């Protein structure tokens, strides 16, 4: 696909009357071609107020983050994988204080482009904490328009026909982000639609690949992670792989980007691969939904085969209701066709039959019977993940390394530890009350399980000082190649051969920076230190309302603003999201 042919991410600004009926307006968006880009933005009318009391009092949200996740990134040169390690419970107020500490705060930046560059440059440095997958909603219950907990689409039949609720799929999830928290390349479970409303806080950057190019992205990912693909042909559903837009562009995969700000809504469409990151502390609410156009996607969605925890929805009720003329063919295994986004020359095949116990898919007690899989260890399920690199990475907290070593590396000779006793129980973790913490120092020690190095403060200050005069500071600690800092070399006389032989380390600015950081001698850098004890307001334990976890070119079309946001890829980098490691590791979405 030529860059001039890449579908543009559209931005819609409906009137209050247009906005009231959610399914009707989504259908209108698709009539304008919004689905071709895989992602669209909706700016709600001013009459729509999802929470009348506002967000000034975080304690009033009455939400606890039962299992925040520490996002540990490994990899280099544009392709990365990420593990999400569960941490101790936090109130939203405590999480906001944590996000404002020097270690986790958003760096100074000129604009979104500058912050994006810093994101990719620092992808492996300081694992952020994400308050992801918090079951619940902070939208007023009497808000009848675009209420994420009840959108009124055909996905409601899962609950109506089977009396099944799937957390985060047909119920709302909350996501509390901080700087650099990431959601990896993925399509939604069962290739559904999704909606994401940013209630408050810092913006969120989104990357998207048009659905018609989704197979091309998969082929590129398979080249970089061949062992993962061989192990599970739906490994991207593990939500732990992030490839930089620069790499995708080199392989002719078109990527567009857009920034979502507080008060704006993002809609993803079936088979639209998307990824992104948060600019700082914020809160988003999200869920999935379905339109009739999705049914063929759902019937032919590729499923993960290496985990019992992946979401699988029975398509029986949808085929019976909306494709009654094909229901018998489908049940007989003769519903021949192709995935809607497969190329025209793709081999025709019959849509998969519903498993015998498919209707019980969401009952946690029945998951293993509904989705039988061969037991595999974490390393077997993620063969491209370099766990040794994580152990050697000086930027990974010691408690995270210890948890991985004790809970993952010991599974080599046996089956995957599926017994509840092998890992902390997730439900039990969600019932824990956050600690009563009075200082930022206590908060940092609490989230780090008390691990600390007395020498880290000095090390952090030294590296922070470098940042002040080194604009191209690169924390991709394993990157073997660095780009020449043309700005530093601009105006200098060319080096002679003799000069280069005397000072080879100075041939590029990034190499000399590596030497200053001890890279030349192989000396690892230490994890950033805890900061000085700044007083914060005591945050009492809050009972959880949940029980689980710019320079666009605009064109107006029929009252709808269309925004062109073809990506100008960042200089280098990439990142990823995690698969599950018992109850220690989980997956994250926007």
Curated annotation (Swiss-Prot):
Residue positions annotated to bind 2-oxoglutarate are: 130, 196, 204, 239
* UniProt GO molecular function: histone H3K36 demethylase activity; histone H3K36me2/H3K36me3 demethylase activity; histone H3K9 demethylase activity; histone H3K9me2/H3K9me3 demethylase activity; metal ion binding
Known EC number = 1.14.11.66
Q: Which family does it belong to?
A: Belongs to the JHDM3 histone demethylase family.
* Low complexity bias spans: 502-513, 537-571
What is the enzyme's main class? Answer: oxidoreductase
Acidic residues compositional bias: what residue ranges? Answer: 445-458
Its recorded reaction(s) are: N(6),N(6),N(6)-trimethyl-L-lysyl(9)-[histone H3] + 2 2-oxoglutarate + 2 O2 = N(6)-methyl-L-lysyl(9)-[histone H3] + 2 formaldehyde + 2 succinate + 2 CO2
Q: Which UniProt keywords apply?
A: Chromatin regulator, Dioxygenase, Iron, Metal-binding, Nucleus, Oxidoreductase, Transcription, Transcription regulation, Zinc
The UniProt regions of compositional bias labelled Basic residues, in chain numbering, are 480-494
Region annotation Disordered: where it falls in the sequence: 372-395, 417-590
* GO process terms (BP): chromatin remodeling; circadian behavior; negative regulation of DNA-templated transcription; regulation of gene expression
An annotated GO cellular component: nucleus
JmjC domain residues are: 140-306
InterPro entries registered for this protein in UniProt:
JmjC_dom (IPR003347), JmjN (IPR003349)
Looking at the record's lineage, which domain of life comes first?
Answer: Eukaryota
Cofactor info, note text: Binds 1 Fe(2+) ion per subunit.
Ranges for domain JmjN come to: 9-51
* Protein name as it appears in the record: Probable lysine-specific demethylase 4B
């Amino acid at each position: 696909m030529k860059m001039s042919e890449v579908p543009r991410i559209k931005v819609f600004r409906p009137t209050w009357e247009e906005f009231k009926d959610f399914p009707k307006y989504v259908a209108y968006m698709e009539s304008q071609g919004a689905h071709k880009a895989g992602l669209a933005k909706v700016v709600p009318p001013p009459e729509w107020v999802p929470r009348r009391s506002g967000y000034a009092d975080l304690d009033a949200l009455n939400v606890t983050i039962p299992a925040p996740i520490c996002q540990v990134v490994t990899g280099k040169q544009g392709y990365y994988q990420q593990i999400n390690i569960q941490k101790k419970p936090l109130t939203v107020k405590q999480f906001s204080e944590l996000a404002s500490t020097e270690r986790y705060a958003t760096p100074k930046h000129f604009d979104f482009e500058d912050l994006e560059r810093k994101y990719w440059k620092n992808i492996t440095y300081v694992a952020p904490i994400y308050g992801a997958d918090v079951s619940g909603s902070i939208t007023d219950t009497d808000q009848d328009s675009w209420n994420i907990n009840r959108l009124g689409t055909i996905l409601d039949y899962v609950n109506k026909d089977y009396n099944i609720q799937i957390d985060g799929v047909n119920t709302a999830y909350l996501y509390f982000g901080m700087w650099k928290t990431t959601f990896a390349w993925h399509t939604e479970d069962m290739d559904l639609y999704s909606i994401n409303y940013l209630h408050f806080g810092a913006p969120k950057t989104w990357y998207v690949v048009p659905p018609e190019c989704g197979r091309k992205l998969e082929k590129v990912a398979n080249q970089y992670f061949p062992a993962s693909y061989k192990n599970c042909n739906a490994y991207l559903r593990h939500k732990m792989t992030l490839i930089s837009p620069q790499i995708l562009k080199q392989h002719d995969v078109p990527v567009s980007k857009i920034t979502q700000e507080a008060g704006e809504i993002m809609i993803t469409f079936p088979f639209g691969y998307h990824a992104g990151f948060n600019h700082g502390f914020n809160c988003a609410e999200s869920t999935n939904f379905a339109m009739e156009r999705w049914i063929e996607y759902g019937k032919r969605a590729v499923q993960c085969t290496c985990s019992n925890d992946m979401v699988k929805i029975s398509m029986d009720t949808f085929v019976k209701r909306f494709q009654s003329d094909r229901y018998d063919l489908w049940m007989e295994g003769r519903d021949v066709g192709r995935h809607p986004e497969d190329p025209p020359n793709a081999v025709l095949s019959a849509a998969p039959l519903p498993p015998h116990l498919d209707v019980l898919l969401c009952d946690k007690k029945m998951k293993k019977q509904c989705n039988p899989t061969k037991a595999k260890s974490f390393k077997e399920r993620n063969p491209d993940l370099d766990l040794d690199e994580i152990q050697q990475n000086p930027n990974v907290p010691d408690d995270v390394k210890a948890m991985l070593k004790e809970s993952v590396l010991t599974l080599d000779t046996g089956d995957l530890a599926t017994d509840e006793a092998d890992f902390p129980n997730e439900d039990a973790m969600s019932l824990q009350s956050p600690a009563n913490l009075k200082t930022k120092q206590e908060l940092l020690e609490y989230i780090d399980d008390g691990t600390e190095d007395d020498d880290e403060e000095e090390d952090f200050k030294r590296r922070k000082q470098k940042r002040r005069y080194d604009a191209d500071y690169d924390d991709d600690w394993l990157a073997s190649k660095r780009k020449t800092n043309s700005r530093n070399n601009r105006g200098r006389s060319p080096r002679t051969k003799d000069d280069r032989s005397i000072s080879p380390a100075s041939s590029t600015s990034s190499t000399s920076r590596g030497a200053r950081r001890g890279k030349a001698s192989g000396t690892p850098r230490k994890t950033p230190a805890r900061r000085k004890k700044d007083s914060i307001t005591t945050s009492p334990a809050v009972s959880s309302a949940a029980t689980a976890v710019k320079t666009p070119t605009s064109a107006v079309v029929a009252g709808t603003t269309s925004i062109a946001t073809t990506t100008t890829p960042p200089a280098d980098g990439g990142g990823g999201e995690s698969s599950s490691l018992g109850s220690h590791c989980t997956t994250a979405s926007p």
